[in-house]
A protein has these predicted regions:
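Aromatic/acidic polysaccharide-binding cleft in carbohydrate-active enzymes
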Residues: 27, 35-36, 468-584, 593-594
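An active-site-proximal structural segment forming one wall of the substrate-binding cleft
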Residues: 199-201, 222-243, 290, 311-350, ...
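Noncatalytic carbohydrate-binding groove/subsite architecture in carbohydrate-active enzymes
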Residues: 194, 200-204, 208-211, 364-503, ...
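C-terminal beta-sandwich/jelly-roll accessory domains of carbohydrate-active enzymes
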Residues: 567-580, 601-681
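Active-site groove signature of glycoside hydrolases
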Residues: 205-207, 249-250, 329-363, 419-427, ...
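The substrate-binding groove and active-site-proximal loops of carbohydrate-active enzymes
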Residues: 218-227, 269-283, 300-309, 351-369, ...
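Extracellular and organelle-lumenal recognition/adhesion modules and their flexible linkers in secreted
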Residues: 2-283, 300, 310, 316, ...
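Solvent-exposed strand-to-loop "edge" motifs in beta-rich extracellular domains
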Residues: 150-155, 193-195, 550, 601-603, ...
Length: 681
């Protein structure tokens, strides 16, 4: 692209009402909810405390203290002959008011959850409180927090306090009366009301002489806890975005996830080191939490089973747990956990990216195909009505993966999965020039479409059943290089929002074959939203997704774009492209034929484009249109928690310039627009 400022160049868009490309399955508007970094824990899930069930190493063995950064890895001893003050304390917990009369043990003999508790020995009574705490919390003013702790107490402990502290001192407390029976774990729940906002720490401290075992502890905003722990404010953004399907629990995480550990009482569920991401999984968000959340939001669940380290029997049992009647073996267990009626989960995936050598349970294509057939048979025996997706790859790489898998599972599964991301700049030695990155990303949907078409052709060629498989494009997005990203989080710009909108337009063009697609992932890492415990920030990618998903109609139409083009040089994993249209457009038509939406991405960083919109095979007498426009203060604008008016979607009614049945419309530079129009009967 040439940086010519403030020019207006001409183009022509032709929308063919009489050339449908296919009916758009609403499940192309999906996203991934994976247990990865702070997508769920620290994002969707309202728990504020890390390592709340005290699994893992003590502080003396961690090279990386901090919230969710150590990823479960043991480090070298810091001191071979001297214990540090945090020895025996599970990281990231720290001692509060330590003395030589306070002793910490990660106790593997007496525990409540999993195989470990946190023990605090107060060897002598004094007037001070001693115990454990962790920092890194963000607290809101005048907010109630529900605190819950599971304790076993021995000896003369006369007072237990759970409190918040900040730079000014105490910021709310709950004085717990430890009246449980001696020798047993007892669960206590109370409320802490904060007085100030800002960074804070949480402390659990006791006074007296004796011993405390802390089996589990929790701190959650009261409004979030009342909603079941998964945040309603993020849920509202999910609904508003036009999303229709949530894929869970992964992603790579699924290849080492054991669903039976994620049911039953929260504090009893064990913590496991998930090998996919080397992160401790507390199992607080399990089957009930996810499926109830989907039900509450009106989302279809898409559940990925563990074909990496899991068994056929576990997968079949999971189907029965979700879908079986309450008098079936696993239906009775479900009912015992509080859910009498089945959820009737229809969409299931037979693993995730098992072709990758990074994946737990990685195998060759023929072995996976056999494994997929075994899983499919067992799961269909539990519920013959379910829809199954097998793991595919792009084109026919990795030992002819798609060829061998498609030919083996043909007719036994319903869909083949494809994953493909734009850019993946980790192969670059340094951050590329701004214009090169702009070109690669705004044109990225074109390279995506080429990969998808090539992949579909290969799968179809080796599929022997009469009915061709559906394609589930169930991971896509923009891989930003975190070496240059602030806070180990991708910084998505308006440029990336145009990529997101353009990718959905390409998926709509392939609606005859793609039945599901899932952007990765919704919150924080690779997310459409940024979220901390008290705030949400809409990225331009969220706005680009919402623009298309919330305002498109049901049938994709053949649409042509004639006008100025540009070439790209290629960048990272993006190939060089020639003659990429500045205007990318697709029309969609309502099922009754009464309404049309024309969505248009102007990829030009600097210039507006004056387009003539020709409606072929029909007409509109409209003189005004409802316009939804994504734009920003500049081409590289982005929102922050404190300033969310740098990019936006503006909705307005606008008069149209109609000349001889052709609509003229000026699409601003670096924008994405949807025009909603009535169609003449």
């Amino acid at each position: 692209m040439t940086p010519d400022h403030n020019e207006t160049v001409p183009a022509t868009l032709t929308v063919h009402l009489d050339r449908p490309l296919g009916k758009i399955n609403p499940f192309i508007y999906g996203t991934n909810i994976e247990h990865l970094e702070n997508l769920i824990y620290g994002g969707l899930w309202g728990e504020l405390l890390d390592r709340r069930k005290f699994a893992g190493h003590d502080g003396g063995r961690l090279p990386n203290r901090g919230r969710r950064r150590d990823r479960g890895l043991a480090g070298p001893w810091r001191g071979e002959f001297t214990d540090e003050a945090n020895f025996g304390l599970v990281a990231p917990w720290e001692p509060v008011n330590p003395t030589d009369q306070v002793f910490f043990v990660h106790d593997n003999t007496t525990f409540y959850s999993g195989s470990q508790s946190q023990r605090i020995d107060l060897l002598a009574a004094d007037d001070d409180y001693h115990g454990i705490g962790q920092d890194g919390l963000e607290i809101a003013t005048g907010t109630d927090y529900v605190a819950r702790v599971v304790l076993q107490i021995e000896g003369a402990i006369d007072s237990v306090v759970l409190r918040l502290r900040d730079a000014k001192g105490e910021n709310g407390r709950w004085n717990l009366l430890p009246d449980g029976p001696a020798g047993d774990f007892t669960s206590y729940e109370g409320t802490i009301r904060s007085e100030r906002s800002g960074p804070a720490s949480f402390e659990l401290v006791a006074r007296g002489q004796g011993r405390l075992w802390v089996g589990a502890v929790s701190l959650m905003r009261a409004d979030v806890a009342a909603d079941g722990g998964l945040r309603s404010d993020i849920g509202a953004k999910i609904v508003a975005s036009g999303l229709k399907m949530l894929r869970w629990p992964g992603g790579n995480f699924a290849s080492d996830y054991f669903w039976m550990e994620g049911i039953g009482p929260l504090d009893r569920r064990p913590t496991r080191l998930n090998r996919a991401w080397n992160e401790y999984e507390p199992n607080d968000v399990g089957t009930h939490e996810f499926l109830d959340y989907c039900e509450r939001l009106g989302m279809a669940p898409f559940v990925c089973v563990n074909t990496g380290s899991g068994s056929v029997e576990d997968a079949a049992a999971w189907v029965e747990y979700c879908n079986g009647p309450s008098d079936s073996e696993w239906g009775r267990v479900r009912a015992g956990n509080g859910r009498e009626q089945p959820w009737n989960v229809h969409y299931w995936s037979l693993g995730n990216e098992i072709w990758g050598d990074f994946q737990v349970g990685h195998v060759d294509p023929e072995t996976y195909a056999q494994r997929a057939l075994e899983f499919a048979a067992a799961m269909k025996a539990a519920d013959p009505s379910i829809h199954l997706t097998a793991v595919g790859h792009v084109r026919n790489v990795l030992g002819r993966w798609n060829e061998l898998v498609a030919s083996a599972v043909s007719g036994q599964v319903d869909a083949i999965a494809v994953h493909y991301y734009n850019l993946n700049p980790a192969v670059l030695a340094e951050e590329p020039p701004v214009q090169d990155k702009w070109d690669a990303l705004v044109a990225g949907p074109k390279s995506t479409a080429a990969v998808l078409r090539d992949t579909i052709e290969i799968i179809d060629r080796h599929w022997s059943a009469d009915l061709l498989p559906e394609i589930s494009y169930d991971e896509w997005g923009i891989r930003e290089d975190l070496r240059w990203a602030p806070g180990w989080k991708e910084l998505y710009l308006l440029r990336d929002g145009l990529n997101t909108a353009g990718t959905l337009q390409e998926i709509q063009r392939l609606s005859g074959r793609i039945s599901m697609s899932h952007q990765f992932g919704f919150v924080n890492r690779l997310g459409l939203l940024d979220a901390n415990p008290n705030q949400i920030n809409e990225t331009p990618c969220y706005q680009g997704f919402r623009l298309i998903a919330a305002h498109s109609e049901a049938i994709a139409l053949e649409t042509e774009s004639a006008g100025p083009t540009f070439d790209t040089a290629g960048l990272a994993t993006e190939p060089p492209l020639e003659a990429v249209p500045y205007l990318d457009a697709i029309g969609t038509l309502s099922e009754d034929g009464a309404r049309m939406a024309v969505s248009v991405v102007n990829r030009h960083r600097y210039d507006a484009i004056n387009a003539k919109i020709v409606i072929s095979g029909g007409s509109t007498a409209a003189t005004t249109a409802t316009v939804h426009e994504l734009n920003g203060t500049d081409a590289l604008a982005h929102n922050t928690y404190d300033d969310q008016r740098q990019t936006w979607i503006e909705t307005r009614e606008q008069e149209l310039n109609v000349n001889s049945g052709t609509i003229e419309y000026v699409f601003p530079a670096h924008s994405a627009t949807v025009l909603e129009l009535p169609i003449d009967a």
